[in-house]
């Protein structure tokens, strides 16, 4: 039987635009201002997953130098860094970091979003090649990449720890994500 897909059309968490995600990694902490007013579905989804501990102990599983560092795939949960690296490069048969997702998908929110700019330090919801297929994986943009502005939802920007973002490598871990702000 095929996988049942559902969209998070209306996450329970309603962003107010004042949320900040404190992403604690094995390399240090990154603080990200979330764009809750501009992309409420994406931020609501991210906040709910973070508050449920979904991202705890996941690894960053892909890096394209000067472009992106990708994390949030549940396939990497508790995998040692060397295994994440080996699996990401095809060295472990049957383990494919980057293919895992939460039990739902969400709609894209880049269209009409004036803040949807891939700048150095932007946090972006990753998705499959199909529209409206984002779930839980995200990436940090490591440079300006306007060619992606109309393809992926940018849901925040790094306000502290850009040096940490640039230091992240495949196998580095998300220890936990804490949401701060007036309604967190």
Task: Report each predicted region and the residues it spans.
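Cyclophilin-like peptidyl-prolyl cis-trans isomerases
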Residues: 1-184
